[in-house]
Amino acid sequence: MALFCLSLFEEKQKPPSKETRHREQVKKPLKKKDSGVQVAKRDDRRAQEQKRDRDRPRDTFMPDTGKSLRVAILIDDIGQDMNALHELLEINAPLSFAVLPRQPHSAEAAKRIHLKNRDVLLHLPMEPKSYPEDRPGNGALFLSMTDKEIRTQFQRNLETVPHAKGVNNHMGSRFTEDTEKMLVVMTALKEKGLFFVDSRTTKDSKAREAADKIGVPFLTRKIFIDNDHNYQASLENLTRWLEDPGMQGNGPVLFIGHPYPSTILAIRDAVSSLRAKGIEIVPVSKIVPQ
Protein backbone atom coordinates (compact mmCIF):
# COMPACT_ATOMS: atom_id res chain seq x y z
CA MET A 1 0.00 0.00 0.00
CA ALA A 2 1.12 3.48 -0.80
CA LEU A 3 1.00 4.30 2.90
CA PHE A 4 3.41 6.79 4.28
CA CYS A 5 5.02 6.02 7.63
CA LEU A 6 4.34 9.49 8.86
CA SER A 7 3.90 10.42 12.50
CA LEU A 8 0.41 10.01 13.84
CA PHE A 9 1.28 12.68 16.40
CA GLU A 10 1.74 15.45 13.86
CA GLU A 11 0.50 18.82 15.09
CA LYS A 12 -2.99 19.60 13.90
CA GLN A 13 -3.12 21.79 10.88
CA LYS A 14 -5.44 24.75 11.13
CA PRO A 15 -8.18 24.48 8.53
CA PRO A 16 -8.27 27.21 5.95
CA SER A 17 -10.87 29.92 6.29
CA LYS A 18 -14.23 29.44 4.63
CA GLU A 19 -13.17 31.81 1.91
CA THR A 20 -10.15 29.72 0.95
CA ARG A 21 -12.08 26.47 1.20
CA HIS A 22 -14.37 27.26 -1.64
CA ARG A 23 -13.00 27.22 -5.14
CA GLU A 24 -13.25 30.44 -7.05
CA GLN A 25 -15.72 30.34 -9.86
CA VAL A 26 -13.79 30.79 -13.06
CA LYS A 27 -15.65 32.62 -15.77
CA LYS A 28 -15.69 30.77 -19.05
CA PRO A 29 -14.63 32.73 -22.11
CA LEU A 30 -17.35 33.48 -24.60
CA LYS A 31 -17.43 31.04 -27.48
CA LYS A 32 -17.88 31.94 -31.08
CA LYS A 33 -21.24 31.06 -32.49
CA ASP A 34 -21.19 27.53 -33.89
CA SER A 35 -22.02 26.87 -37.50
CA GLY A 36 -24.92 24.62 -38.49
CA VAL A 37 -22.48 21.79 -39.26
CA GLN A 38 -20.83 22.09 -35.84
CA VAL A 39 -24.22 22.05 -34.11
CA ALA A 40 -25.24 18.93 -36.04
CA LYS A 41 -22.01 17.15 -35.14
CA ARG A 42 -22.37 18.11 -31.50
CA ASP A 43 -25.98 16.88 -31.38
CA ASP A 44 -24.91 13.60 -32.98
CA ARG A 45 -22.16 13.10 -30.38
CA ARG A 46 -24.63 13.88 -27.61
CA ALA A 47 -27.09 11.30 -28.95
CA GLN A 48 -24.34 8.66 -29.08
CA GLU A 49 -23.30 9.43 -25.49
CA GLN A 50 -26.91 9.16 -24.30
CA LYS A 51 -27.26 5.78 -26.03
CA ARG A 52 -24.07 4.51 -24.36
CA ASP A 53 -25.45 5.63 -21.00
CA ARG A 54 -28.72 3.75 -21.62
CA ASP A 55 -26.86 0.60 -22.70
CA ARG A 56 -24.39 0.63 -19.79
CA PRO A 57 -25.09 -2.34 -17.47
CA ARG A 58 -26.25 -1.41 -13.98
CA ASP A 59 -24.31 -2.64 -10.93
CA THR A 60 -26.29 -5.57 -9.61
CA PHE A 61 -25.10 -5.00 -6.05
CA MET A 62 -26.27 -1.37 -5.85
CA PRO A 63 -29.99 -1.20 -5.07
CA ASP A 64 -32.00 1.66 -6.50
CA THR A 65 -32.43 3.92 -3.47
CA GLY A 66 -33.12 7.06 -5.43
CA LYS A 67 -29.74 8.48 -4.42
CA SER A 68 -27.11 9.38 -7.00
CA LEU A 69 -24.30 7.47 -5.33
CA ARG A 70 -23.18 5.75 -2.16
CA VAL A 71 -19.71 6.12 -0.69
CA ALA A 72 -17.78 4.42 2.08
CA ILE A 73 -14.83 5.96 3.90
CA LEU A 74 -12.34 3.48 5.37
CA ILE A 75 -9.69 4.68 7.82
CA ASP A 76 -6.53 2.56 7.93
CA ASP A 77 -3.77 2.17 10.54
CA ILE A 78 -6.02 2.17 13.60
CA GLY A 79 -4.66 0.69 16.84
CA GLN A 80 -1.85 3.03 17.78
CA ASP A 81 -3.45 6.39 18.62
CA MET A 82 -6.70 6.26 20.58
CA ASN A 83 -7.05 10.05 20.57
CA ALA A 84 -7.26 10.10 16.77
CA LEU A 85 -9.81 7.28 16.85
CA HIS A 86 -11.93 9.19 19.36
CA GLU A 87 -12.01 12.24 17.04
CA LEU A 88 -12.99 10.08 14.07
CA LEU A 89 -15.78 8.38 15.99
CA GLU A 90 -17.19 11.81 16.86
CA ILE A 91 -17.76 12.58 13.17
CA ASN A 92 -21.45 12.22 12.36
CA ALA A 93 -21.04 9.62 9.62
CA PRO A 94 -20.71 5.81 9.57
CA LEU A 95 -16.98 5.68 8.86
CA SER A 96 -15.32 2.25 8.74
CA PHE A 97 -12.01 1.34 10.38
CA ALA A 98 -9.15 -1.03 9.53
CA VAL A 99 -7.27 -2.02 12.68
CA LEU A 100 -3.64 -3.12 12.62
CA PRO A 101 -3.03 -6.36 14.55
CA ARG A 102 -0.82 -6.72 17.62
CA GLN A 103 -0.61 -3.00 18.33
CA PRO A 104 -0.85 -1.43 21.80
CA HIS A 105 -4.55 -0.62 21.32
CA SER A 106 -5.70 -3.10 18.66
CA ALA A 107 -8.32 -4.92 20.73
CA GLU A 108 -9.43 -1.81 22.63
CA ALA A 109 -9.87 0.13 19.40
CA ALA A 110 -11.84 -2.67 17.73
CA LYS A 111 -14.18 -2.96 20.70
CA ARG A 112 -14.79 0.78 20.84
CA ILE A 113 -15.50 0.92 17.11
CA HIS A 114 -17.94 -1.97 17.44
CA LEU A 115 -19.76 -0.28 20.33
CA LYS A 116 -20.26 2.72 18.04
CA ASN A 117 -21.88 0.41 15.45
CA ARG A 118 -19.13 1.07 12.90
CA ASP A 119 -17.48 -1.54 10.68
CA VAL A 120 -14.24 -3.13 11.91
CA LEU A 121 -11.74 -4.62 9.45
CA LEU A 122 -8.44 -6.37 10.08
CA HIS A 123 -5.71 -4.27 8.44
CA LEU A 124 -3.52 -7.21 7.46
CA PRO A 125 0.19 -6.36 7.03
CA MET A 126 1.79 -7.85 3.90
CA GLU A 127 5.23 -7.74 2.36
CA PRO A 128 5.90 -4.64 0.20
CA LYS A 129 8.38 -4.41 -2.67
CA SER A 130 10.37 -1.93 -0.60
CA TYR A 131 11.01 -4.47 2.20
CA PRO A 132 13.20 -4.43 4.30
CA GLU A 133 13.55 -0.66 3.92
CA ASP A 134 9.83 -0.39 4.70
CA ARG A 135 8.62 -2.88 7.27
CA PRO A 136 4.94 -3.83 7.30
CA GLY A 137 4.87 -4.32 11.06
CA ASN A 138 3.67 -6.91 13.54
CA GLY A 139 1.91 -9.96 12.16
CA ALA A 140 3.02 -9.41 8.56
CA LEU A 141 2.68 -12.04 5.83
CA PHE A 142 5.77 -12.73 3.69
CA LEU A 143 6.28 -14.69 0.49
CA SER A 144 8.92 -16.77 2.28
CA MET A 145 6.26 -18.22 4.59
CA THR A 146 4.75 -21.65 4.08
CA ASP A 147 0.99 -21.94 3.59
CA LYS A 148 0.66 -23.20 7.16
CA GLU A 149 2.64 -20.25 8.52
CA ILE A 150 0.42 -17.82 6.60
CA ARG A 151 -2.75 -19.40 8.01
CA THR A 152 -1.33 -19.40 11.55
CA GLN A 153 -0.19 -15.79 11.29
CA PHE A 154 -3.58 -14.73 9.96
CA GLN A 155 -5.43 -16.47 12.78
CA ARG A 156 -3.24 -14.85 15.44
CA ASN A 157 -3.79 -11.45 13.88
CA LEU A 158 -7.54 -11.92 13.74
CA GLU A 159 -7.64 -12.79 17.43
CA THR A 160 -6.25 -9.35 18.30
CA VAL A 161 -8.93 -7.51 16.27
CA PRO A 162 -12.34 -8.64 17.57
CA HIS A 163 -15.56 -7.99 15.62
CA ALA A 164 -13.79 -7.85 12.24
CA LYS A 165 -16.20 -8.15 9.30
CA GLY A 166 -13.53 -8.06 6.64
CA VAL A 167 -9.85 -7.65 5.82
CA ASN A 168 -7.80 -5.20 3.80
CA ASN A 169 -4.08 -5.21 3.07
CA HIS A 170 -1.53 -2.99 4.79
CA MET A 171 1.27 -2.39 2.27
CA GLY A 172 1.54 -5.69 0.35
CA SER A 173 2.71 -4.49 -3.07
CA ARG A 174 4.83 -7.65 -3.40
CA PHE A 175 2.62 -10.13 -1.57
CA THR A 176 -0.62 -9.27 -3.38
CA GLU A 177 1.04 -9.89 -6.76
CA ASP A 178 1.51 -13.58 -5.88
CA THR A 179 -1.57 -15.56 -6.89
CA GLU A 180 -0.76 -18.70 -4.91
CA LYS A 181 -0.17 -16.85 -1.65
CA MET A 182 -3.32 -14.78 -2.11
CA LEU A 183 -5.28 -17.99 -2.64
CA VAL A 184 -4.08 -19.15 0.79
CA VAL A 185 -5.26 -15.87 2.33
CA MET A 186 -8.62 -15.97 0.56
CA THR A 187 -9.21 -19.55 1.69
CA ALA A 188 -8.67 -18.43 5.30
CA LEU A 189 -11.11 -15.54 4.79
CA LYS A 190 -13.70 -17.86 3.26
CA GLU A 191 -13.54 -20.12 6.30
CA LYS A 192 -14.20 -17.13 8.58
CA GLY A 193 -16.94 -15.60 6.43
CA LEU A 194 -14.96 -12.39 5.84
CA PHE A 195 -14.80 -10.11 2.80
CA PHE A 196 -11.64 -8.60 1.30
CA VAL A 197 -10.92 -4.98 0.37
CA ASP A 198 -7.96 -4.50 -1.96
CA SER A 199 -6.10 -1.32 -1.06
CA ARG A 200 -4.51 -1.49 -4.53
CA THR A 201 -0.91 -0.80 -3.55
CA THR A 202 0.10 -2.30 -6.90
CA LYS A 203 -1.60 -2.26 -10.29
CA ASP A 204 -0.68 -5.94 -10.69
CA SER A 205 -2.59 -7.15 -7.65
CA LYS A 206 -3.96 -10.69 -7.90
CA ALA A 207 -6.39 -10.20 -5.03
CA ARG A 208 -9.51 -10.04 -7.19
CA GLU A 209 -8.50 -13.12 -9.17
CA ALA A 210 -7.91 -15.09 -5.96
CA ALA A 211 -11.10 -13.84 -4.31
CA ASP A 212 -13.20 -14.78 -7.33
CA LYS A 213 -11.69 -18.25 -7.47
CA ILE A 214 -12.33 -18.97 -3.78
CA GLY A 215 -15.67 -17.14 -3.62
CA VAL A 216 -14.78 -14.33 -1.23
CA PRO A 217 -16.78 -11.07 -1.44
CA PHE A 218 -14.42 -8.47 -2.88
CA LEU A 219 -14.16 -4.69 -3.16
CA THR A 220 -11.36 -2.45 -4.37
CA ARG A 221 -10.27 1.00 -3.29
CA LYS A 222 -11.20 3.85 -5.62
CA ILE A 223 -9.41 6.86 -4.12
CA PHE A 224 -6.72 7.46 -1.51
CA ILE A 225 -7.78 10.55 0.40
CA ASP A 226 -4.50 11.74 1.84
CA ASN A 227 -1.48 10.83 -0.27
CA ASP A 228 -0.33 14.44 0.09
CA HIS A 229 -0.93 14.52 3.85
CA ASN A 230 -2.53 17.93 3.36
CA TYR A 231 -5.93 19.29 4.40
CA GLN A 232 -6.85 21.05 1.18
CA ALA A 233 -5.72 18.17 -1.05
CA SER A 234 -7.61 15.66 1.11
CA LEU A 235 -10.78 17.76 1.00
CA GLU A 236 -10.57 18.01 -2.78
CA ASN A 237 -10.02 14.25 -3.09
CA LEU A 238 -13.23 13.69 -1.13
CA THR A 239 -15.31 16.02 -3.29
CA ARG A 240 -13.73 16.41 -6.74
CA TRP A 241 -15.28 13.25 -8.19
CA LEU A 242 -18.71 14.81 -7.70
CA GLU A 243 -17.85 16.98 -10.70
CA ASP A 244 -16.70 14.01 -12.80
CA PRO A 245 -19.64 12.35 -14.61
CA GLY A 246 -17.34 9.44 -15.48
CA MET A 247 -17.15 8.41 -11.83
CA GLN A 248 -20.86 8.69 -11.18
CA GLY A 249 -23.18 5.89 -12.22
CA ASN A 250 -20.37 3.34 -11.92
CA GLY A 251 -21.35 1.93 -8.55
CA PRO A 252 -20.34 2.87 -5.00
CA VAL A 253 -17.04 4.63 -4.31
CA LEU A 254 -14.58 3.51 -1.63
CA PHE A 255 -12.24 6.09 -0.13
CA ILE A 256 -9.29 5.08 2.04
CA GLY A 257 -7.60 7.50 4.43
CA HIS A 258 -5.53 7.56 7.60
CA PRO A 259 -5.91 9.05 11.08
CA TYR A 260 -3.85 12.15 10.27
CA PRO A 261 -5.05 15.43 11.83
CA SER A 262 -5.44 16.96 8.35
CA THR A 263 -7.50 13.98 7.14
CA ILE A 264 -9.79 14.10 10.16
CA LEU A 265 -10.52 17.78 9.51
CA ALA A 266 -11.08 17.16 5.79
CA ILE A 267 -13.55 14.32 6.41
CA ARG A 268 -15.40 16.36 9.02
CA ASP A 269 -15.80 19.24 6.58
CA ALA A 270 -16.65 17.03 3.58
CA VAL A 271 -19.51 15.11 5.21
CA SER A 272 -22.05 17.93 4.98
CA SER A 273 -21.04 18.71 1.38
CA LEU A 274 -21.51 15.10 0.33
CA ARG A 275 -24.92 14.85 1.96
CA ALA A 276 -26.00 18.15 0.44
CA LYS A 277 -25.33 16.60 -2.97
CA GLY A 278 -27.57 13.63 -2.13
CA ILE A 279 -24.64 11.30 -1.49
CA GLU A 280 -25.21 8.55 1.05
CA ILE A 281 -22.27 7.67 3.30
CA VAL A 282 -22.45 4.00 4.29
CA PRO A 283 -20.31 1.36 6.03
CA VAL A 284 -17.90 -0.57 3.81
CA SER A 285 -19.85 -3.79 4.37
CA LYS A 286 -22.89 -2.21 2.69
CA ILE A 287 -21.16 -1.80 -0.68
CA VAL A 288 -19.27 -5.09 -0.90
CA PRO A 289 -20.81 -7.19 -3.70
CA GLN A 290 -22.10 -10.48 -2.33
Segments predicted by a language model, with ranges:
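C-terminal domain-boundary segment and adjacent tail
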Residues: L189-T201, P259-Q290
